[in-house]
Design a protein with these regions (language model features):
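Residues at structural and domain junctions
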Residues: 52, 201, 460-461, 471, ...
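Extracellular LysM carbohydrate-binding repeats and other cell-envelope/extracellular binding modules
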Residues: 480-507
């Protein structure tokens, strides 16, 4: 007779892809007639943007564009000039499995880049982008949690796990005309643009969540004067978004990954015809995971006290994900300027942040590196550029043991000029770690009891058990009830602490 089991459905996130995909981007740019000739390229700033991610079958398609700002000097070398261009790209990823309702996030970064002036009017750019891709699907498992039959003894285990409610990709548009403050010179060319999205509050509610935050925009631009230095401008675009997810509630835990998306910055004329307005068009995408904490109970072993017993088991992988509170790290290093030739810092920024989380003995650690970029003016009134890669390791106590991952961003960078050859740079980082605890569980899949088999006659026995033996194993060997062995031997422990005789009575 096939035994009926009570089952519980468990929904968990299954990661069907986690890796880095390379994507080449090659382009060339010819300066318009109104631009000055290139004497020297100072810096090429590449900002890759993912515009869409779509799944079909076991294939994932990622579309985006690489936004490039090239800073260069003309023959005089006394002012920064620049141009910008964009190049679209498409990348395909083969998933490990075909699944429905796949959600994926792709974080682009620059792996390698060459920017070369072929002549005074043309620039060749060869870029290799890396796409850090993570794709998820919700897997549904039926787990046996008990057998309601007095002829069967069951052994159960409980796991505190994370239940998947849903994963949502949420894109929205932020658009604003930002006016320069009084006293700022009009804009001729945007030389550098960076956008950082900051999440301030996340409020779960029935059917989704309300997310508030802001987009922090920094601009370096060139004025219409060949003798004036480039100027900086920053602004904030606040946002409030409602993210919908079926089945979500106030008891959900929410994790948000902010993907940059599209970014377009265009100077616009004001009412008197001067370019003192910046039109900002941003289209960020949030990858929002909704989860709930729960307890899963599995029947990991069973046997019959009457009749022949045949059971089939399956192995399960259950997970508990813990998002640790954000941590701030300060990295302070010196950036050296060649030939003691520093007069003025025109701009400083950081790029290329990479983070790796790992464990070291009883501690958790995050190893990271990023590049500090410095645009400055020399004592001879010439414009120059230098950069330095900084690395750091942050060690702290590991309160939870598991597979660690980390996300982070540089929230601010400050500097102090200590002398004509040294700039002391201080970068503030915000990091958020996630710990995945994986449980290898065993669960009953099916079982049959042969009722035609004659039950064994009543018997009593004495078994001489060794220290360390489990009461369950002894009861299973003799097809006896665990409760009877505990009662007859006055033994409440699961594992015997000493050698002793065990009375076994089976009715």
């Amino acid at each position: 007779m096939r035994m009926e089991t009570n089952t519980e459905r468990y929904d968990g996130f299954e990661q069907i892809f986690d890796g880095v995909q390379e994507c080449p981007v090659d382009t060339e740019y010819t300066l318009p007639d109104y631009c000055a000739d290139i004497q020297k390229i100072l810096k090429c700033i590449v900002t890759p943007e993912v515009t869409s991610v779509s799944a079909a079958g076991d294939s994932l398609t990622i579309d985006g564009c690489a936004s490039m700002h090239v800073l260069y000097l003309d023959a005089k070398g006394g002012c920064v000039r620049g141009f910008d261009t964009k190049k679209e790209f498409t990348c395909s990823v083969r998933l490990r499995a075909q699944a429905e309702n796949v959600t994926a996030e792709a974080e682009p970064f620059v792996q390698h880049m060459t920017c070369r002036a072929m002549n005074a009017r043309r620039v060749d750019l060869h870029i290799t982008l890396g796409l850090s891709v993570r794709a998820y699907a919700v897997r549904q498992l039926e787990i046996a949690d008990c057998i309601s039959d007095d002829r069967v003894e069951t052994k159960c285990e409980e796991y505190g796990v994370t239940r998947a409610v849903g994963c949502v990709m949420h894109a929205f548009i932020l658009e604003q005309n930002a006016e320069l403050p009084n006293g700022k010179s009009p804009i001729e060319t945007v030389l550098r643009c960076s956008v950082r999205y900051q999440i301030d509050t996340v409020q779960p509610q029935a059917g989704g969540a309300v997310v508030t935050g802001k987009a922090c925009v920094e601009i370096l631009y060139r004025t219409f004067s060949d003798t004036a230095m480039p100027e900086r401008f920053s602004c904030i675009l606040p946002f409030t978004q409602t993210v919908e997810c079926a089945g979500a509630g106030e008891d959900c835990t929410i994790q948000i990954s902010v993907l940059g998306g599209e970014c377009t910055v265009q100077p616009r004329e004001d009412s008197v015809g001067e370019y003192t307005v910046l039109n900002l068009y941003l289209k960020p995408t949030f990858c929002v995971q909704f989860t709930k904490s729960c307890t899963v109970r599995t029947v990991c072993d069973a046997y019959s006290i009457k009749g022949a017993w045949a059971a089939k088991y399956k192995n399960l992988s259950l997970e508990r994900c813990e998002v640790l509170p954000p941590r701030s790290v300060r990295v302070k290093e010196n950036v050296l300027v060649p030939e003691n030739d520093l007069e003025q810092v025109l701009d400083i920024w950081c790029e290329g942040l990479t983070l790796t989380a790992f464990t070291e003995k009883e501690n958790a650690a995050v190893r990271g590196k990023f590049t500090v970029c410095l645009l400055y003016r020399t004592k001879e009134k010439q414009i120059a550029y230098t950069e330095r890669m900084l690395d750091f390791t942050d060690v702290h106590t590991a309160e939870i043991v598991g597979r660690r991952s980390v996300r982070g961003e540089i929230t601010s960078v400050q500097y102090v000029i200590t002398d004509s050859s040294t700039v002391e740079c201080t970068a503030e980082l915000r990091m958020e770690e996630q710990v995945r605890v994986v449980y290898a569980a065993r669960s009953l899949e099916s079982a049959e009891l042969d009722e035609t088999t004659e039950p064994e006659p009543c018997c009593a026995a004495v078994y001489y058990a060794s220290s360390g033996e489990k009461v369950w194993d002894i009861a299973k060997r003799y097809h006896a009830r665990v409760s009877a062995i505990r009662t007859h031997n006055d033994c409440m422990e699961d594992v015997l602490s000493e050698d002793r005789p065990v009375i076994i009575c089976r009715k």
